Structure formats: structure tokens, C-alpha cells
Amino acid sequence: MPSIAPFLRTTPLFTISLLLRLGLLFYGIYQDAHSALKYTDIDYLVFTDASRFVADGQSPYARDTYRYTPLLAWILLPTVRFPAFGKLVFAAADLLAGWLILRVLRRRGMDEATAGGFSALWLWNPMVATISTRGSSEGLLGVLTMGLLWAVDRRKFSLAAIILGLSVHFKIYPFIYAPAIVWWMDDARLGKETKAAPQSSSIKDAVANFFTPDRLKFGLLSLITFMILNLVMFAIYETPFLVHTYFHHVTRIDHRHNFSPYNVLLYLTSATPAHAAPAFRIESFAFLPQLLLSCVLIPLALAKRDLATSMMAQTFAFVTFNKVCTSQYFLWYMIFLPLYLPNSSFLRNGKLGIFALLLWIVSQAAWLQQGYELEFLGISTFYPGLWLASIAFFLVNCWILGVIISDGARQSTRSTVKFHVE
């Protein structure tokens, strides 16, 4: 039986990845020209319209529903003359993220073909390639988050802090990685001599030992980067920048294409007049379990064992418990799969891995079937069909999250990969 290992070496790995994305780009151009169902994501039209407003000397927020940093509209300014430019940027970001994954895996001691095999989970993933070539900007988030992990892994903490500040400015959610990285940055990992804590050390001493110069520098530099970007954007675009880039996402009530268990509740809330809305709304407190898991409990439990697994679990928890959950959000945690899977239960136990994948796909398909009847056939499936499908998908994700956390908790700080691609 021929080996696939030659295709997993760096040059063929990225050649195939590039051809996949180019093929999808050309297919998308054909489908947009010949089909009523367009390949290009509606968000891409929002991005390019915003760039057109910027090119005309106006605010990107002159475009209704533009809810992003002006940086994105600036990056996509060439789309005014070359409409496909943004898709090329997003596809290139996918490839760069894959290269960073490969670098991190190689640094862990994997041979080239094995590291390429796991990197292919991102680089050859049709879902990843399709989302970026349709014009979704999630590929940029992928390269930023993987760049953050790569920089920390290489002990380039100043660069990591700048990337973190930029990432949070770009999409808010990467702030969840700050607690994990800061907790991970102990003397042992920084190559410094660890001092044995006296038995009678006070809380004051423990706090003083935690706030080391390296941790303070990392936190301050990331905060300064974030604030400088925000101050510049506020100076140019004033209040609309804050409202559309940040405040909108805090108060967002979006029930369309939303896998979240809060989906039906958000629909009912959106249909309720403001004067009749109850003072206490349960969806307003959705962030409590979400942030408790992703910013406190998971980092404390996993970060010092395996930072990549911690970031995977944090992101998975954040997406699962978010009150708005769309298919693009899945890419936020899929970027970490190649780093988590080598030592995971899903790979050690093939049946468990296949079962989890099938359960995740089937529960998602059940939701999509209900959503199709609602959106395209005009059948009201909000209750019980769509609600039950949302609950089922949520429970499946909670179970998968539990497995990921258990895997991370079992890891030693010196885990190594002991298999190779044949």
C-alpha cells in the first residue's frame, strides 16, 4: 500500500493546500456568476462595502451591519479595484496559520511527516478552506491566535504581548488566553531558578511572587497595544467605533444561524417590545458560566500542563457557552486541533474519536435541517424542533469539552509524541 508520508512533507503539504484554496476561489467565481445561491459570504460584501466607504473618505460604519475594527476595512482597501483581494488575504492567512502549526509541532519533537499530518487537519480541512475563500475573516483570527501560541512557545513574550493586544482589538474573544499565558509563565518555564517557598509564607508573599516582572511586562505591553489601537481608531471614528466594534457584541441579540441553546430565547426577546421586556433576562447572564470556565477554571487546571490544550479547551468552552454561536466560530478552536490531538483520548481510542466526530456532525445536521425548514420552507420550527436540536448540540459539545479537559489534566508538563506517519 503506497505511503502518504511523501505528501505530508512541507513542500507538497503546502502545494496541495494552496491548490485547494485556488480551486475553491475559481469555483466561487463561477458559482457567483451562474447560480442564484451565491458562494461569497454576505459578510464579505459588508467588508468590501466598508472598504469602499473608506476609500471615498468616509467611515466604514457608514455601511450598515459593519461591526468590526476599521483595521479590517483598511486591509481590504485593494478590493475597491480587485474584488477578490480579501479572499486571497484570508486564504493566505490560513496557510500562514498552518505554517505556524507546523513550526510548533516540529519544536515538540515530531518528524516532518508526522507534523505535516497533523497540520493537514487545518491546511487540508475543506471547512477551513471554504470559509476563508467565501470571504470570512476568521482566517486572520487563526493566524493571530496561532502566532500568539508560537511566540509564547519560543519565549518571545514581547511579541506575544503585542499579538495578544492586536488580537483582542480585532475580535475581543482572545482576551481569554491572557490568564492561561500569565499562569503558564512561571520561573521554571522562563528558565529561571525556582526558589522554594517558605512554609509560613503569607498571602502577601504569594501575591508578590505571582506578579513577577515578566508577567507584569507581558500584561502591560498587551494592554498598551490594545489601548493605542483603540485610541487611534476612536480619534478617527469617535463613538461609532466603540458602539459597532465593542458595545454591539455585548448587547447582541442574534437568533439567525445561531447554534446556541439561547437561540429561541433570543428570538422571543427580539420580538418583545422594549417597554414589555422583563427586568431580569436570563440571556444577560450567559457570560457568567462562559467566562468562569474559559478565563478561570480551565486555565488554572490546564495551562501549566499543556498551554495548547488549555487554549483549545478555553476556546471550545467560550464558543459552546456563548449566546451566539455560528459555524465560523468553530474555526476558533479548530486551529488548536493539530496540537491537542496527538496526545488525546480521541486518537488513542479510535472508536471514541469516530463516535465523537459522528455525534458532533449528526447533532449539527439535525439543527441545520430544522434551520432549513425555518429559513427556506417558512415552517415555524423554533419550538420544539430547533430548540431541542440546539440543546442536543450543546450537550454533545459539553461532553467533548469534558474529554478535552480530562486529557489536559492527565498530561505531564513534558509530554512527547511517540508515533510517526508511515
From Swiss-Prot:
Q: Enumerate the subcellular locations listed in this protein's record, separating them with semicolons.
A: Endoplasmic reticulum membrane
Membrane topology, as annotated, equals: Multi-pass membrane protein
- A single GO BP annotation from the record? cell wall organization
Alphabetically list the UniProt keywords.
Cell wall biogenesis/degradation, Endoplasmic reticulum, Glycosyltransferase, GPI-anchor biosynthesis, Membrane, Transferase, Transmembrane, Transmembrane helix
Which Pfam families does the record cross-reference, listed alphabetically? Mannosyl_trans (PF05007)
- Please give the pathway this protein is involved in: Glycolipid biosynthesis; glycosylphosphatidylinositol-anchor biosynthesis
Give a yes or no for keyword Ubl conjugation in this entry.
Answer: no
Chief location bin: endoplasmic reticulum
Q: EC number(s) for this protein? A: 2.4.1.-
Q: Which InterPro entries match?
A: PIG-M (IPR007704)
Segments spanning the bilayer are: 10-30, 82-102, 162-182, 216-236, 282-302, 327-347, 352-372, 385-405
Q: Which Gene Ontology terms cover its molecular function?
A: alpha-1,4-mannosyltransferase activity; glycolipid mannosyltransferase activity
* One GO cellular component term: glycosylphosphatidylinositol-mannosyltransferase I complex
Q: What class of enzyme is it?
A: transferase
Q: Which residues form a coiled coil?
A: none
Protein family (similarity comment): Belongs to the PIGM family.
Summarizing the function annotation, the protein's role is: Mannosyltransferase involved in glycosylphosphatidylinositol-anchor biosynthesis. Transfers the first alpha-1,4-mannose to GlcN-acyl-PI during GPI precursor assembly. Required for cell wall integrity.
- This chain belongs to the protein called GPI mannosyltransferase 1
